[in-house]
Amino acid sequence: MESTSPLEQQGNHMEESAKIGILVEELQNELERLKDRRNSLRIAKEHRDENPYFKKGTRHLAEFFYSKGFLIVDYGKDVGEHYQLGKQIYACLDVSWDFVSRLLASKEQEFRYEAGDISNEAFVNLHNLCIQMQKKDMLEFCLDDRAFFITSKLKGEHRKFLSGECYEAANRYLIEKAIRDFSKDIGFSVYRNVLLKRADSDDDKKNDVQLDFVVEFDDRFYIFETKAGMRMAIDKWVDRTRLFADEKNKFITCCLQDFDPKTFEPFILLPMKSLESDFRNLLEQEFQASRH
């Protein structure tokens, strides 16, 4: 048996000591991670106990989001002040899209909007839309034959609504209609503009996630995001799907663009043009599958 020299023995000891040092450091790091995790869970539980939404009729909703690592900060149960106007804008989208875009983009308070090349039906729809927007104090207008003379009175809240919230209102209408067409007996609740914060966050004034709509059924939740612009924001809805979707609960992105929903499978993206029928079909598939 070959003997090792004192120098070699010293080298072996140093190598073993280095390995032990690495293991000790890894164990210490793991203990720190476990300590941080335990602390986060403690904070989350304290916040859960203080959160009012676990003590109301929203307990089921609060439990769902807590299971995903979030607490409810706030939500809107009503349909919103401009719900009917949002439905109207979407109903005449062929003419309202261009008009609203022009209204938002105009740098002048007063401008002329020519409507001579649109159909009579579209002209009537645009006229009715202007009447309703005038009632909401968003604009004033007068007509000269087929031209609209517009005086913009848009405020910040109006711009926010016309830039996207109006399509959320239309979305809600289509979603609720699809549910009622699917079943007159099914119970559900709709929550608008749901604000969430991470359960272990100590910042009471900050929300980490905003959700357009959450539909609550007895045993599942469907979360809806509305994309009114041309940018798909793929990273956002992929992240949200991973956060909230599972076998029963779904995250659904509704877009103004027209496309084949199968393009984005397994993620659920539905064009608003066919949202009502697409969502009704999804309900039929999901609820039928749960019965077997």
Regions found by a protein language model. Give the residues of each.
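Intrinsically disordered, low-complexity Ser/Thr/Pro/Gly-rich regulatory segments
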Residues: 6, 15-292
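N-terminal nucleotide-handling cores and adjacent loading/scaffold lobes of large enzymes
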Residues: 1-2
